[in-house]
């Protein structure tokens, strides 16, 4: 079984990309429902507040995202979203029977801006949590950032820069994001090996082609 945790930015700066985000996410879900193997999905939306809309739902049963759930407002409480999700999933695994703990856990973090609104978690706290889960349990984290230096921000979270990508926060960039995310998830679900560093090459190529600067 694979544990999939999506941390999605729904802050006000995502305005205008709601339909693209919803469509990309649902297309990715549709592809993953057809893949072999069991998976459970958690989806966390963040702005000023944190909202969990899927809590470890079997991939076949995850409902599509709608505009009633995904709408933009507020600031960017990214640390609280990531820290809260790690704490919750970690506790579930801690108290589960060994045979019920997923073999693989993958967090997919997407943001179009820097942290500016968290109240419960700090960079140091979240970095410690991420490093602990990676080292002890082999959890994997990918970080997709727009309008920021994604590699530098990922490092502050304890995520290796090979697992971070800058993307263009527009219709084409968002669609490509979810295509690549789906491919990365397929790779993780199909193999016991860690995700290869070339998971993001299509996003990197698009970012460079369209004038992105690191």
Model-predicted segments: where are they?
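Acidic, low-complexity intrinsically disordered regions
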Residues: 1-214
């Amino acid at each position: 079984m694979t544990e999939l945790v999506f941390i999605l930015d729904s802050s006000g700066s995502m305005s205008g990309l709601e339909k693209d985000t919803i469509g990309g996410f649902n297309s990715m879900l549709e592809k993953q429902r057809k893949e072999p193997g069991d998976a459970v999905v958690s989806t966390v939306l963040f702005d000023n507040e944190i909202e969990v809309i899927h809590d470890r739902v079997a991939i076949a049963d995850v409902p599509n995202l709608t505009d009633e759930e995904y709408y933009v407002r507020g600031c960017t409480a990214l640390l609280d979203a990531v820290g809260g999700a790690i704490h919750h999933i970690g506790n579930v695994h801690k108290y589960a029977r060994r045979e019920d703990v997923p073999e693989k856990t993958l967090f997919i973090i997407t943001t179009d801006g820097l942290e500016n609104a968290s109240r419960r978690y700090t960079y140091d706290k979240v970095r410690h949590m991420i490093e602990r889960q990676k080292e002890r349990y082999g959890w994997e984290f990918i970080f997709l950032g727009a309008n920021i230096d994604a590699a530098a921000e990922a490092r502050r979270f304890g995520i290796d820069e090979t697992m971070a990508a800058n993307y263009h926060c527009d219709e084409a960039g968002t669609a490509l994001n979810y295509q690549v995310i789906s491919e990365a998830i397929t790779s993780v679900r199909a193999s016991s090996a860690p995700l290869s560093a070339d998971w993001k090459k299509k996003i990197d190529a698009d970012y460079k082609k369209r004038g992105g600067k690191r």
